[in-house]
Protein backbone atom coordinates (compact mmCIF):
# COMPACT_ATOMS: atom_id res chain seq x y z
CA UNK A 1 0.00 0.00 0.00
CA UNK A 2 1.36 3.42 -0.92
CA UNK A 3 2.54 5.51 2.02
CA UNK A 4 0.69 8.44 0.44
CA UNK A 5 -2.60 6.77 1.35
CA UNK A 6 -1.78 6.49 5.03
CA UNK A 7 -1.76 9.38 7.47
CA UNK A 8 -1.79 8.00 10.99
CA UNK A 9 -1.94 11.41 12.68
CA UNK A 10 -5.20 12.52 11.03
CA UNK A 11 -7.51 11.12 13.67
CA UNK A 12 -10.53 12.32 15.61
CA UNK A 13 -9.34 13.13 19.14
CA UNK A 14 -12.78 12.33 20.54
CA UNK A 15 -12.50 8.72 19.39
CA UNK A 16 -9.96 5.99 20.25
CA UNK A 17 -6.78 6.60 18.25
CA UNK A 18 -6.15 4.13 15.50
CA UNK A 19 -2.90 2.16 15.91
CA UNK A 20 -2.34 3.47 19.45
CA UNK A 21 -2.62 0.59 21.92
CA UNK A 22 -1.73 2.84 24.86
CA UNK A 23 -5.09 4.58 24.54
CA UNK A 24 -6.75 1.29 25.44
CA UNK A 25 -4.75 0.31 28.50
CA UNK A 26 -6.95 0.72 31.56
CA UNK A 27 -9.92 1.77 29.43
CA UNK A 28 -12.46 -0.52 31.14
CA UNK A 29 -15.90 1.02 31.68
CA UNK A 30 -18.32 -0.40 34.27
CA UNK A 31 -21.97 0.23 35.13
CA UNK A 32 -24.01 -1.78 37.65
CA UNK A 33 -21.64 -4.73 37.43
CA UNK A 34 -21.54 -4.80 33.61
CA UNK A 35 -18.12 -4.02 32.14
CA UNK A 36 -16.80 -3.10 28.69
CA UNK A 37 -13.16 -3.91 27.88
CA UNK A 38 -11.66 -3.01 24.49
CA UNK A 39 -11.21 -6.13 22.36
CA UNK A 40 -8.47 -4.61 20.19
CA UNK A 41 -6.94 -1.17 19.59
CA UNK A 42 -9.26 -0.45 16.68
CA UNK A 43 -12.55 -2.35 16.87
CA UNK A 44 -14.61 -4.33 19.37
CA UNK A 45 -15.16 -4.70 23.12
CA UNK A 46 -15.75 -7.57 25.55
CA UNK A 47 -18.92 -7.42 27.67
CA UNK A 48 -18.80 -9.13 31.06
CA UNK A 49 -21.23 -9.33 33.96
CA UNK A 50 -24.51 -9.29 32.00
CA UNK A 51 -26.97 -12.16 32.45
CA UNK A 52 -30.26 -12.50 30.55
CA UNK A 53 -32.91 -15.07 31.48
CA UNK A 54 -35.43 -14.33 28.75
CA UNK A 55 -37.76 -12.55 31.17
CA UNK A 56 -36.21 -9.79 33.29
CA UNK A 57 -34.56 -7.16 31.07
CA UNK A 58 -31.55 -5.14 32.20
CA UNK A 59 -32.15 -1.62 33.44
CA UNK A 60 -32.57 1.16 30.91
CA UNK A 61 -29.28 2.65 32.14
CA UNK A 62 -27.45 -0.60 31.35
CA UNK A 63 -29.17 -0.88 27.97
CA UNK A 64 -28.06 2.64 27.05
CA UNK A 65 -24.56 1.88 28.35
CA UNK A 66 -24.35 -1.12 26.01
CA UNK A 67 -25.81 0.82 23.09
CA UNK A 68 -23.26 3.61 23.52
CA UNK A 69 -20.51 1.00 23.73
CA UNK A 70 -21.67 -0.58 20.49
CA UNK A 71 -21.50 2.77 18.69
CA UNK A 72 -18.06 3.50 20.15
CA UNK A 73 -16.39 0.14 19.61
CA UNK A 74 -18.21 -1.24 16.57
CA UNK A 75 -18.92 -4.68 18.00
CA UNK A 76 -19.63 -6.20 21.40
CA UNK A 77 -18.62 -9.76 22.28
CA UNK A 78 -20.64 -11.14 25.20
CA UNK A 79 -18.96 -13.80 27.32
CA UNK A 80 -20.40 -17.35 27.33
CA UNK A 81 -23.18 -17.55 29.90
CA UNK A 82 -24.57 -14.10 29.13
CA UNK A 83 -27.56 -15.63 27.37
CA UNK A 84 -28.78 -19.09 26.42
CA UNK A 85 -29.70 -19.98 22.85
CA UNK A 86 -33.44 -19.83 23.55
CA UNK A 87 -33.09 -16.27 24.91
CA UNK A 88 -30.86 -14.93 22.14
CA UNK A 89 -33.76 -12.91 20.72
CA UNK A 90 -33.95 -10.97 23.99
CA UNK A 91 -30.32 -9.88 23.62
CA UNK A 92 -30.86 -8.78 20.02
CA UNK A 93 -33.98 -6.86 21.06
CA UNK A 94 -31.99 -4.65 23.45
CA UNK A 95 -30.62 -2.77 20.45
CA UNK A 96 -33.74 -2.30 18.34
CA UNK A 97 -36.34 -4.33 16.46
CA UNK A 98 -34.95 -7.78 15.68
CA UNK A 99 -36.06 -9.56 12.53
CA UNK A 100 -35.24 -12.57 10.42
CA UNK A 101 -32.42 -12.02 7.93
CA UNK A 102 -33.35 -13.21 4.46
CA UNK A 103 -31.52 -12.57 1.19
CA UNK A 104 -32.49 -13.65 -2.32
CA UNK A 105 -29.36 -15.81 -2.76
CA UNK A 106 -29.51 -17.42 0.73
CA UNK A 107 -33.12 -17.95 1.90
CA UNK A 108 -33.26 -18.05 5.70
CA UNK A 109 -33.65 -21.17 7.80
CA UNK A 110 -36.17 -20.10 10.43
CA UNK A 111 -35.67 -20.99 14.11
CA UNK A 112 -38.50 -21.42 16.62
CA UNK A 113 -38.15 -17.69 17.23
CA UNK A 114 -39.48 -16.00 14.09
CA UNK A 115 -36.89 -13.24 14.51
CA UNK A 116 -33.91 -15.62 14.48
CA UNK A 117 -32.46 -17.88 11.80
CA UNK A 118 -29.69 -20.49 11.77
CA UNK A 119 -26.37 -20.68 9.94
CA UNK A 120 -25.42 -24.37 9.98
CA UNK A 121 -22.31 -25.71 8.22
CA UNK A 122 -23.88 -29.16 7.97
CA UNK A 123 -26.80 -27.71 6.02
CA UNK A 124 -24.96 -25.27 3.75
CA UNK A 125 -21.58 -23.59 3.47
CA UNK A 126 -21.48 -20.59 1.12
CA UNK A 127 -18.46 -18.87 -0.37
CA UNK A 128 -20.05 -15.47 0.13
CA UNK A 129 -19.36 -15.78 3.87
CA UNK A 130 -15.64 -15.62 3.11
CA UNK A 131 -15.74 -12.26 1.31
CA UNK A 132 -15.61 -8.94 3.17
CA UNK A 133 -19.10 -7.46 3.28
CA UNK A 134 -21.82 -5.44 4.98
CA UNK A 135 -24.98 -7.47 5.48
CA UNK A 136 -27.52 -6.62 2.77
CA UNK A 137 -25.53 -3.66 1.41
CA UNK A 138 -27.45 -4.15 -1.84
CA UNK A 139 -30.50 -2.60 -0.13
CA UNK A 140 -31.12 1.12 0.33
CA UNK A 141 -31.45 0.58 4.09
CA UNK A 142 -29.33 -2.34 5.31
CA UNK A 143 -29.88 -3.53 8.91
CA UNK A 144 -28.35 -1.30 11.57
CA UNK A 145 -26.92 -4.21 13.55
CA UNK A 146 -26.33 -7.94 13.18
CA UNK A 147 -26.24 -10.36 16.12
CA UNK A 148 -24.88 -13.93 16.31
CA UNK A 149 -24.87 -16.66 18.95
CA UNK A 150 -22.45 -19.60 18.89
CA UNK A 151 -24.51 -22.68 19.70
CA UNK A 152 -22.03 -25.21 18.27
CA UNK A 153 -18.50 -24.13 17.37
CA UNK A 154 -15.47 -26.02 16.02
CA UNK A 155 -12.63 -26.97 18.34
CA UNK A 156 -10.41 -24.92 16.04
CA UNK A 157 -10.94 -22.50 13.16
CA UNK A 158 -14.17 -20.90 12.00
CA UNK A 159 -13.22 -17.46 13.31
CA UNK A 160 -14.97 -14.27 12.22
CA UNK A 161 -12.92 -11.28 11.07
CA UNK A 162 -14.06 -7.68 11.55
CA UNK A 163 -12.76 -4.49 10.01
CA UNK A 164 -13.59 -0.88 10.84
CA UNK A 165 -14.52 1.17 7.76
CA UNK A 166 -14.37 4.38 9.80
CA UNK A 167 -10.81 3.61 10.85
CA UNK A 168 -9.98 2.79 7.23
CA UNK A 169 -11.25 6.23 6.19
CA UNK A 170 -9.03 7.81 8.84
CA UNK A 171 -5.99 6.31 7.07
CA UNK A 172 -6.75 8.07 3.78
CA UNK A 173 -4.67 10.96 2.53
CA UNK A 174 -6.83 14.11 2.91
CA UNK A 175 -6.62 14.97 -0.80
CA UNK A 176 -7.77 11.51 -1.84
CA UNK A 177 -10.50 11.56 0.83
CA UNK A 178 -11.92 14.81 -0.54
CA UNK A 179 -12.04 13.34 -4.05
CA UNK A 180 -13.73 10.16 -2.85
CA UNK A 181 -16.41 12.24 -1.14
CA UNK A 182 -17.57 13.43 -4.58
CA UNK A 183 -18.16 9.90 -5.89
CA UNK A 184 -21.10 7.51 -5.92
CA UNK A 185 -20.92 3.71 -6.03
CA UNK A 186 -23.33 1.09 -7.35
CA UNK A 187 -24.16 -1.86 -5.07
CA UNK A 188 -25.71 -5.00 -6.51
CA UNK A 189 -26.70 -8.36 -5.03
CA UNK A 190 -25.33 -9.99 -8.22
CA UNK A 191 -21.84 -8.42 -8.10
CA UNK A 192 -20.19 -11.79 -7.36
CA UNK A 193 -22.72 -13.84 -9.32
CA UNK A 194 -24.27 -15.58 -6.33
CA UNK A 195 -27.83 -14.90 -7.45
CA UNK A 196 -27.20 -16.69 -10.75
CA UNK A 197 -25.76 -19.64 -8.85
CA UNK A 198 -28.81 -19.79 -6.57
CA UNK A 199 -31.45 -19.67 -9.34
CA UNK A 200 -30.86 -21.89 -12.37
CA UNK A 201 -34.30 -21.19 -13.85
CA UNK A 202 -34.16 -18.06 -16.03
CA UNK A 203 -37.66 -16.86 -15.16
CA UNK A 204 -37.06 -17.29 -11.44
CA UNK A 205 -33.71 -15.51 -11.71
CA UNK A 206 -35.34 -12.60 -13.56
CA UNK A 207 -38.03 -12.34 -10.88
CA UNK A 208 -35.42 -12.18 -8.12
CA UNK A 209 -33.41 -9.56 -10.05
CA UNK A 210 -36.55 -7.45 -10.37
CA UNK A 211 -37.01 -7.55 -6.59
CA UNK A 212 -33.44 -6.39 -5.90
CA UNK A 213 -32.30 -3.89 -8.53
CA UNK A 214 -28.89 -2.19 -8.14
CA UNK A 215 -28.80 0.81 -5.81
CA UNK A 216 -26.55 3.87 -5.60
CA UNK A 217 -24.89 5.27 -2.47
CA UNK A 218 -22.12 7.77 -1.67
CA UNK A 219 -18.67 6.17 -1.66
CA UNK A 220 -17.90 8.05 1.56
CA UNK A 221 -20.83 8.47 3.90
CA UNK A 222 -21.56 9.74 7.39
CA UNK A 223 -22.58 7.34 10.13
CA UNK A 224 -26.16 8.41 10.95
CA UNK A 225 -25.59 8.32 14.73
CA UNK A 226 -21.90 9.12 15.33
CA UNK A 227 -21.53 11.51 12.39
CA UNK A 228 -18.14 10.00 11.52
CA UNK A 229 -17.06 9.42 7.93
CA UNK A 230 -16.48 5.93 6.59
CA UNK A 231 -15.61 4.10 3.40
CA UNK A 232 -18.86 2.64 2.08
CA UNK A 233 -17.62 -0.03 -0.30
CA UNK A 234 -17.37 -3.78 0.17
CA UNK A 235 -16.07 -6.61 -1.98
CA UNK A 236 -19.24 -8.68 -1.99
CA UNK A 237 -21.75 -6.12 -3.20
CA UNK A 238 -19.99 -2.97 -4.53
CA UNK A 239 -19.99 -3.24 -8.32
CA UNK A 240 -18.53 -0.01 -9.69
CA UNK A 241 -18.04 3.74 -9.21
CA UNK A 242 -20.26 5.94 -11.34
CA UNK A 243 -18.61 8.33 -13.79
CA UNK A 244 -15.34 6.40 -14.05
CA UNK A 245 -14.13 3.99 -16.70
CA UNK A 246 -14.26 0.29 -15.85
CA UNK A 247 -10.50 0.12 -15.24
CA UNK A 248 -10.38 3.33 -13.19
CA UNK A 249 -13.36 2.25 -11.12
CA UNK A 250 -11.89 -1.18 -10.41
CA UNK A 251 -8.48 0.27 -9.63
CA UNK A 252 -9.87 2.77 -7.13
CA UNK A 253 -12.11 0.16 -5.51
CA UNK A 254 -9.08 -2.11 -5.06
CA UNK A 255 -7.28 0.72 -3.24
CA UNK A 256 -10.25 0.99 -0.87
CA UNK A 257 -10.58 -2.77 -0.47
CA UNK A 258 -6.87 -2.92 0.43
CA UNK A 259 -7.52 -0.41 3.20
CA UNK A 260 -10.54 -2.39 4.42
CA UNK A 261 -8.46 -5.60 4.41
CA UNK A 262 -5.53 -3.97 6.19
CA UNK A 263 -4.63 -5.68 9.50
CA UNK A 264 -4.22 -2.18 10.95
CA UNK A 265 -8.01 -1.75 11.04
CA UNK A 266 -9.25 -5.27 11.73
CA UNK A 267 -9.46 -7.90 14.44
CA UNK A 268 -10.33 -11.59 14.69
CA UNK A 269 -12.93 -13.16 16.95
CA UNK A 270 -12.37 -16.74 18.07
CA UNK A 271 -15.68 -18.38 18.88
CA UNK A 272 -16.46 -20.24 22.08
CA UNK A 273 -19.65 -22.17 22.65
CA UNK A 274 -22.18 -19.71 24.06
CA UNK A 275 -20.44 -16.56 22.81
CA UNK A 276 -22.93 -13.89 21.69
CA UNK A 277 -21.94 -11.07 19.40
CA UNK A 278 -23.48 -7.92 17.95
CA UNK A 279 -21.91 -5.44 15.54
CA UNK A 280 -22.74 -2.13 13.90
CA UNK A 281 -23.43 -3.22 10.34
CA UNK A 282 -23.21 0.38 9.14
CA UNK A 283 -19.49 0.78 9.84
CA UNK A 284 -18.06 -2.67 10.61
CA UNK A 285 -17.51 -5.16 7.79
CA UNK A 286 -16.99 -8.86 8.41
CA UNK A 287 -16.09 -12.17 6.82
CA UNK A 288 -15.80 -15.77 7.95
CA UNK A 289 -12.80 -18.08 7.76
CA UNK A 290 -13.44 -21.50 6.22
CA UNK A 291 -10.61 -23.33 7.95
CA UNK A 292 -12.61 -25.74 10.11
CA UNK A 293 -12.94 -28.60 7.64
CA UNK A 294 -15.88 -30.88 8.34
CA UNK A 295 -16.30 -29.69 11.94
CA UNK A 296 -19.80 -28.58 12.89
CA UNK A 297 -20.46 -24.84 13.20
CA UNK A 298 -24.00 -23.71 14.06
CA UNK A 299 -24.80 -20.07 14.76
CA UNK A 300 -28.07 -18.25 15.45
CA UNK A 301 -28.47 -14.90 13.71
CA UNK A 302 -30.79 -11.90 13.86
CA UNK A 303 -30.61 -8.51 12.21
CA UNK A 304 -31.79 -5.38 13.97
CA UNK A 305 -33.50 -2.29 12.58
Q: Each predicted region: which residue ranges?
A:
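Non-heme Fe(II) oxygenase catalytic core, chiefly the N-lobe of the double-stranded beta-helix
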Residues: 2-276, 282-305
Amino acid sequence: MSALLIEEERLDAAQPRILDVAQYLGATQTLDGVSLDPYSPVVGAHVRGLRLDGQTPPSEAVRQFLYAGLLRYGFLAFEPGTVQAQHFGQLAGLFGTARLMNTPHTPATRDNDNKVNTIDSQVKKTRMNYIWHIDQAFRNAPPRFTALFGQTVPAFGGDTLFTNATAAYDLLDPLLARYLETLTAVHDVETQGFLTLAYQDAAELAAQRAKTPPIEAPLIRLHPETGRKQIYANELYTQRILGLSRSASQGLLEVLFDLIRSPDVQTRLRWQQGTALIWDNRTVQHRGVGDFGTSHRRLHRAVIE
